[in-house]
Regions:
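Hydrophobic cores of alpha-helical transmembrane segments in multi-pass integral membrane proteins
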Residues: 1-8, 27-53, 64-91, 98-148, ...
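Electron-transfer interface patches adjacent to heme c in soluble/periplasmic c-type cytochromes
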Residues: 223, 228, 269, 286-408
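Long, contiguous internal "core" modules enriched in hydrophobic/ aromatic residues
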Residues: 8-22, 201-204
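Flexible, glycine/threonine-enriched loop-and-boundary segments that flank and lead into catalytic domains
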Residues: 20, 55-64
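Post-cleavage N-terminal segment of exported redox proteins
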Residues: 186, 190-193, 197-254, 371, ...
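Individual transmembrane alpha-helices with interfacial aromatic-anchor signatures
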Residues: 153-163, 399-408
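Electrostatic cytochrome c docking/interface patches
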Residues: 242-266, 278-281, 285, 310, ...
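The canonical Cys-X-X-Cys-His
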Residues: 261, 267-276, 326, 412, ...
Length: 425
């Protein structure tokens, strides 16, 4: 008989804790564990955001940006940092200059990511809830878009703090790596190390996947076929769009001047803060108008749907405001919307339109399938100048003293006033 008091139960040691000592002492292992943790978080959140109800809340908000950075900074960033801390001492045959500094980098990096992500998540959920808030009468609770911007401005400060902390950690990495290289011996001694590979499974280079890895030509051809098939699947719907759009629903293409304005819109990065895609949900319809349709983007190359709404959607902006409003808005956004956080674009008022390039642009779009007339193709420059003169005359009648008939602001106004005005269903 055994006495119960003499029996000691020792639970089995989980295999993943075999290196727990290193996890406590080695910053490199800590970086890898943190990277995998952030990867797991981002991987879980991705499918979560694919759920229709969740996506309708988070789409176009800061939440999506936070989600992307969780993987970019946490997974890619920390994995890279860990690899650098590991490989640099190996390459220079020395020890890492300061493990303590690497640990500090780890923790301020984690803190920075958490500050950034949590602030973006909170801002995104706030935006989504405010945009979709509808009262008992079926009206928007926050009809003025800028109300939703003001509410999340304090969270911008936390986001900035998170970014500063992450960058500070990166500076520590650079300094640590620099000092590690500096302390390396001047004459590097190469050592030949024999390593015995122990494996319970014998490796047969002529079997299975090992054999496939050695067939470079066959592997290249198979990869090329896969890429071509994927490309065709993506491109085919665009090339066959006419099959899906009724003739009476087709839209008019942008005029040469509007095309120039569209290029300015893209060049200045307007698409990073504004979308041009109205969703089929009640709040989007109340705020912006009818949902976007396929034909409205059929001549957009590339499309300007956007992925974030720091500012409102512009899909149906055309004719909503007079030309003077757009002029003042570009010169000084605070002149028309006091709480606006949009930057000013005063150089558009003084920079000239490159009229000479318009004919080539129109010809290129025509080759891509945009149905421009022979007159547009042969006389694009003069047609653009005529339209610009009309807009400049309207602005002059509304109080603008400068002659802007050849300025970029005129082309941009022409483009903005054309949005949602080209026909369609």
């Amino acid at each position: 008989m055994y006495s119960a008091s003499t029996i000691k139960y020792k639970p089995p040691r989980p295999i993943f804790l075999a290196g727990e000592f290193l996890l406590r002492t080695d910053p490199i292992i800590k970086f890898f564990v943190a990277a995998i943790t952030f990867y797991a978080m981002a991987t879980f959140e991705g499918p979560l955001l694919s759920i229709k109800a969740v996506n309708s809340l988070g789409h176009y908000t800061d939440w999506i940006v936070g989600h992307v950075h969780l993987g970019t900074l946490g997974w890619n960033g920390f994995l890279t940092f860990g690899m650098l801390y590991f490989i640099v001492p190996k390459l220079w045959n020395t020890e890492l200059y300061s493990k303590k500094m690497a640990n500090i980098h780890l923790w301020i990096g984690i803190l920075g990511i958490l500050f950034y992500y949590v602030s973006m998540l909170a801002a995104g959920i706030t935006q989504g809830l405010m945009w979709r808030a509808v009262d008992a009468n079926g009206q928007l609770v926050y009809p003025d878009f800028v109300e939703t911007v003001i509410r999340i401005i304090p969270l911008f400060l936390f986001r900035a703090l998170g970014g500063v902390l992450f960058l500070a950690g990166y500076v520590l990495l650079l300094y640590n790596v620099y000092k590690t290289i500096k302390q390396a011996p001047k004459e590097l001694v190469e050592e030949t190390v024999q390593v015995r590979i122990s494996s319970s499974t014998p490796i047969h280079p002529e079997r299975g996947h090992r054999k496939l890895e050695g067939m470079a030509a066959a592997f290249t051809i198979l990869a090329l076929i896969a890429i071509l098939v994927g490309s065709i699947i993506e491109i085919a719907p665009t090339l066959s769009i006419n099959k899906y759009v009724k003739t009476e629903n087709k839209v008019e293409p942008f005029t040469p001047l509007e095309l120039a304005g569209r290029d300015i819109y893209v060049k200045e990065g307007c698409y990073t803060c504004h979308s041009q895609m109205i969703r089929t949900i009640q709040s989007d319809g109340l705020r912006y108008g009818a949902a976007s349709t396929i034909e409205e983007s059929m001549y957009d190359r590339p499309f300007q749907w956007g992925s974030k709404r720091t500012g409102p959607d512009l899909a149906r902006l055309g004719k909503k405001y007079p030309d003077l409003w757009h002029y003042m808005h570009m010169e000084d956004p605070r002149a028309v919307i006091k709480e606006s956080i949009m930057p000013a674009y005063p150089w558009l008022i003084t920079s000239k339109i490159d009229f000479d390039s318009l004919q080539k642009k129109v010809s290129l779009f025509n080759k891509l399938g945009v149905p421009y007339s022979d007159e547009d193709l042969s006389d694009a420059n003069n047609r653009a100048k005529e339209q610009a003169k009309k807009i400049a005359d309207v602005l002059k009648s509304q109080g603008v003293k400068e002659d802007v008939s050849d300025k970029k602001i005129t082309a941009l106004i022409a483009y903005l006033q054309a949005l949602g005005q080209k026909g369609g269903e």
